[in-house]
């Protein structure tokens, strides 16, 4: 194993290195390398932004016939991440930077150009002052004038700041706040006025609707009162339906008096009951004088008959639709029993 780990090699006495064949490779050979974008750039084809530090698999080659102080310059080929367009840039050893060559534009290039222009102007001035002492004096006078102008401008700015310092900013803010509060209060009052008007309109409409409903109900009640009922409707009329038509306490009292008073006095049904005439008095004429008891009874009945006829006529004249409708069942029963008693007598 130690023989395979030798540190020196054996060269025979007739060794000639020029006779060893060498591998001939092309000078513009390309290598695939992994690198990061050296600056921010934007693709000219699709407008995609490629930021500094993004990694690419680039192809590297040596630029032919271009050297800087004997240092070779390398070119790199990358592809856009969006449209796969080819972008090339190369090294710039003079400025220790990279220079964009094709396929994209470098961002923040304007700032770099301005800096380069300033450096160029400064270099030209130094070259002029190096060989011309009068140029040095002219540049000094120009610089002094520029400095005086700058000081004057600075003094004007200070005076302007002092003038503005005298302004009462707190008072201005207070006035602005007061104006805002007044405007808000005015808007609130207008809103309240509008809501009040809307509520008044709705209230008037509701009052009109209620008035129309009351008028309709009154008309219905009047129509119910003016309906002419038949005398026989009192037998089929229900007390619950008849009591709904009452509108005053006086009418209720009168109806109650009529219904209850029918127990002792012949009621409203007296006009509806047909009285039977005595068959003996109608068929047989009385030839003989009646006995004293019969005469007395006859005088009593004769005295009662006109009274009953008067009461029946007055009851029939006093019968109204309201009384017919307001008769209670107890009053009807009493009146009917009175009529039966009178007929049986």
From Swiss-Prot:
Q: How does it assemble?
A: Component of the spliceosome. Present in the activated B complex, the catalytically activated B* complex which catalyzes the branching, the catalytic step 1 C complex catalyzing the exon ligation, and the postcatalytic P complex containing the ligated exons (mRNA) and the excised lariat intron.
Question: Which keywords does this chain's UniProt record carry?
Answer: Metal-binding, mRNA processing, mRNA splicing, Nucleus, Spliceosome, Zinc
Q: Where is the composition biased (Basic and acidic residues)?
A: 217-232
Q: If researchers knock out this gene, what phenotype do they report? A: Morpholino knockdown of the protein causes small head and a curled tail by day 2. Knockdown causes increased sensitivity to IR-induced apoptosis. In double morpholino knockdown of TP53 and YJU2, TP53 deficiency rescues animals from developmental neurodegeneration observed on YJU2 mutants and radiosensitivity.
State the protein's name: Splicing factor YJU2
Q: Where is the composition biased (Low complexity)?
A: 308-317, 327-337
- The entry's Zn(2+)-binding residues are 43, 46, 80, 83
Q: Which family does it belong to?
A: Belongs to the CWC16 family. YJU2 subfamily.
Q: Name one GO molecular function term.
A: metal ion binding
UniProt keyword annotation of Zinc present: yes
- Give me the ranges of the annotated region Disordered: 205-345
Identify the species of origin.
Danio rerio (Zebrafish)
- State which gene encodes it: yju2
Q: Name one GO cellular component term.
A: U2-type catalytic step 1 spliceosome
Q: Does the keyword Heme apply?
A: no
Entry function:
Part of the spliceosome which catalyzes two sequential transesterification reactions, first the excision of the non-coding intron from pre-mRNA and then the ligation of the coding exons to form the mature mRNA. Plays a role in stabilizing the structure of the spliceosome catalytic core and docking of the branch helix into the active site, producing 5'-exon and lariat intron-3'-intermediates. May protect cells from TP53-dependent apoptosis upon dsDNA break damage through association with PRP19-CD5L complex.
Where is this chain primarily localised?
nucleus
Give the taxonomic lineage as stored in the record.
Eukaryota, Metazoa, Chordata, Craniata, Vertebrata
Give start-end of the signal peptide. none
> Which pairs of positions does the record mark as disulfide bonds?
none
Which BP terms from GO are recorded? generation of catalytic spliceosome for first transesterification step; negative regulation of DNA damage response, signal transduction by p53 class mediator; negative regulation of neuron apoptotic process; RNA splicing
User: Which InterPro entries does this UniProt record tie to the protein?
Assistant: Saf4/Yju2, Yju2
């Amino acid at each position: 194993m130690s023989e395979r780990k030798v540190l020196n090699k054996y060269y025979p006495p007739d060794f000639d290195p020029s006779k060893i064949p060498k591998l001939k490779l092309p000078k513009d050979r390309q290598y695939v390398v992994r690198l990061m974008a050296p600056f921010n750039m934007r693709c000219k084809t699709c407008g995609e932004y490629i930021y500094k530090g993004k990694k690419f698999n680039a192809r590297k080659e040596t630029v032919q016939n271009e050297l800087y102080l004997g240092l070779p310059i390398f070119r790199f080929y990358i592809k856009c991440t969006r449209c796969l367009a080819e972008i090339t840039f190369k090294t710039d050893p003079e400025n220790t930077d990279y220079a964009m060559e094709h396929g994209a534009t470098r961002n923040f290039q304007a700032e770099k150009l301005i800096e380069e222009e300033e450096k160029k102007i400064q270099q030209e001035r130094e070259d002029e002052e190096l060989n011309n002492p009068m140029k040095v004096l002219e540049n000094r006078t120009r610089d002094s004038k520029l400095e005086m102008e700058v000081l004057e401008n600075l003094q004007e700015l200070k005076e302007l700041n002092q003038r503005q310092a005298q302004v009462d900013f707190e008072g201005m803010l207070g006035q602005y706040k007061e104006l805002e509060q007044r405007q808000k209060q005015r808007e609130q009052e207008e809103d309240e006025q509008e809501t009040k008007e809307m509520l008044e309109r709705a209230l008037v409409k509701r009052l009109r609707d209620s008035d129309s409903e009351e008028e309709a109900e009154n008309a219905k009640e009047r129509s119910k009162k003016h309906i002419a009922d038949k005398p026989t409707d009192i037998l089929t009329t229900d007390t619950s339906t008849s009591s709904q038509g009452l509108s005053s306490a006086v009418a209720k009292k009168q109806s109650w008096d009529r219904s209850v008073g029918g127990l002792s006095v012949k009621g409203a049904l007296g006009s509806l009951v047909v009285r039977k005439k005595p068959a003996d008095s109608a068929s047989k004429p009385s030839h003989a004088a009646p006995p004293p008891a019969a005469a007395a009874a006859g005088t009593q009945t004769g005295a009662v008959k006109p009274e009953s006829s008067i009461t029946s006529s007055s009851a029939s004249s006093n019968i109204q639709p309201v009384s017919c409708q307001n008769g209670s069942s107890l009053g009807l029963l009493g009146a009917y029993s009175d009529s039966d008693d009178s007929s049986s007598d």
